[in-house]
């Protein structure tokens, strides 16, 4: 127990990855039960982090540091704040529900999901940029395997487009990481890739700009930001159901997390200088993504563009530079992960029953599957930001925070979100209450949800409603992380490095 308490965060990172290796030696049937047990234990470990997290304490918590290759600044350094903590929780919840949902190819999915869970735990808690980048890149492999092995039409093309876009963009970020590591050595006489050390650096104006661009490109493709999103409809719609869940609920959050952890605190001045073009890009995501979703004939592609559109609201919250907006963005990242998981699982059930996702083929499903229709409606309403649902809270806070920064664009973004209600409710009407084409027997005898599907979706609905009615459970620790981030951004904006060193220690963000 003493070891677990001292190294809890490391256990959270490596336990699912090591457990995934053991699944190689199990049968298909046994691997599913095994994966459920491992994912449940992992969730309990994350809840231990939650229980031990002190919202009154500034700085990183559960911090662990081990020197590995000191000469080149490669150290194992992990820790969490109020922002990272909830992405760990989201990761644990999504993976547990996913392994429970798995219906076929259980062994392959169990291994990929557990591997990805551990890798993402590493992404959200790594404070050494070499480890962060390693986890960031390795996360591509399990998802690429799921798309290429179990995807729909054009799965190879979709997988390769996803891989090449994200891998090549990440190389830009790698160049920036290596440059800053060497720049730190020039300033302090030793190399460091520790993000908390980097907060002490001041970059020259010319170098600062290209470093900002290098990081932004690597991050933008992962979210993805417009116009670097063209891999998204292929990957999301052609991946198997759980592949789509991983991409939309978890991997997209890597990008917005990197904005908060790296881009804003390292380059606060440039983040403010380029606020207007970035905000316009986010607004394009909301409007353009909404119109594209409205025109889709395939339900899964519609959900993909809906996800893309909602991530635009998250980006606006991130660049609000105030507690309300950033807290709203983090809350919405969590909410979006839960909601979009529900939508893709429901779409997957529809595809399993009918071998199609073409909206025009459906109709009158509510008559034969009223429980399925009810679940779909509740998740759909959360997606459009219905009050008292989890989708409303993050969206409202993000736009409220951005309104204080850029009122006109916030108003346009707020009114544009009406689009999501239009395309979601229109597609719902067509699928569940539209006229059924004659001879379509698969739809007329549509089987309602089974016990396992009801169980998984009930957990999603409980989260949607409980956290929508009582969001304070999440918002308190998130607010703590947002305030710390803003303190670092403000300090990094000071003109003199001497003041910067002193102030960082005063707010205790560097917690040695």
Residues covered by each model-derived region:
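Alpha-helical multi-pass transmembrane bundles of energy-transducing inner-membrane proteins
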Residues: 29, 111-115, 119-207, 292-305, ...
């Amino acid at each position: 127990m003493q070891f677990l308490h001292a190294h809890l965060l490391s256990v959270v990172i490596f336990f699912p990855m090591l457990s995934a290796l053991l699944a190689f030696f199990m049968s298909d049937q046994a691997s599913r039960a095994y994966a459920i047990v491992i994912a449940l234990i992992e969730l309990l470990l994350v809840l231990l982090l939650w229980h031990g997290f002190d919202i009154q304490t500034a700085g990183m918590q559960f911090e662990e540091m081990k020197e590995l290759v000191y000469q080149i600044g490669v150290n194992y350094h992990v820790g969490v704040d109020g922002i990272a903590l909830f992405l760990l929780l989201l990761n644990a919840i999504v993976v547990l529900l996913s392994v429970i949902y798995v219906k076929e190819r259980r062994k392959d999915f169990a291994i990929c999901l557990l591997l990805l869970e551990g890798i993402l735990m590493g992404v959200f808690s790594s404070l050494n940029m070499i480890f962060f980048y390693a986890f960031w890149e390795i996360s591509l492999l399990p998802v690429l395997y799921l798309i290429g092995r179990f995807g729909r039409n054009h799965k190879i093309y979709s997988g390769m487009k996803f891989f090449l876009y994200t891998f090549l963009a990440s190389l830009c970020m790698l160049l920036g990481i290596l440059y800053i590591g060497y720049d730190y050595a020039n300033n302090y006489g030793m190399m460091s890739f520790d993000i908390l050390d980097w907060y002490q650096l001041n970059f020259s104006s010319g170098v600062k700009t290209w470093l900002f661009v290098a990081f932004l490109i690597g991050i933008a493709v992962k979210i993805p930001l417009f116009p670097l999103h063209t891999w998204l409809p292929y990957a999301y719609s052609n991946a198997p159901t759980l592949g789509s869940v991983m991409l939309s609920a978890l991997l997209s959050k890597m990008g917005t997390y990197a904005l908060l952890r790296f881009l804003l605190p390292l380059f606060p001045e440039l983040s403010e200088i380029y606020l207007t073009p970035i905000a316009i890009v986010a607004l394009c995501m909301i409007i353009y993504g909404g119109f594209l979703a409205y025109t889709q004939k395939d339900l899964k592609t519609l959900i993909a563009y809906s996800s893309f559109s909602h991530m635009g609201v998250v980006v606006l919250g991130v660049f609000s530079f105030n507690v309300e907006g950033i807290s709203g963005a983090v809350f919405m990242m969590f909410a979006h992960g839960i909601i979009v998981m529900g939508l893709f699982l429901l779409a997957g059930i529809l595809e399993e029953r009918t071998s199609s996702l073409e909206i025009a083929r459906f109709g009158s499903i509510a008559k034969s599957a009223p429980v399925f229709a009810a679940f779909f409606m509740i998740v759909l309403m959360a997606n459009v930001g219905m009050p008292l649902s989890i989708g409303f809270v993050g969206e409202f806070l993000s736009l409220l925070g951005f309104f204080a920064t850029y009122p006109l664009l916030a108003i346009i973004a707020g009114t544009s979100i009406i689009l999501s209600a239009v395309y979601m409710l229109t597609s719902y009407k067509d699928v569940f209450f539209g006229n059924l084409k004659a001879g379509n027997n698969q739809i007329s005898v549509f089987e309602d949800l089974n016990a396992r599907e009801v169980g998984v979706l009930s957990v999603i609905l409980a989260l949607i409603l409980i956290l929508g009615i009582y969001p304070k459970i999440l918002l308190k620790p998130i607010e703590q992380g947002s305030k710390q981030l803003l303190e670092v951004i403000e300090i990094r904006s000071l003109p003199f490095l001497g003041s910067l060193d002193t102030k960082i220690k005063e707010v205790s963000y560097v917690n040695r």
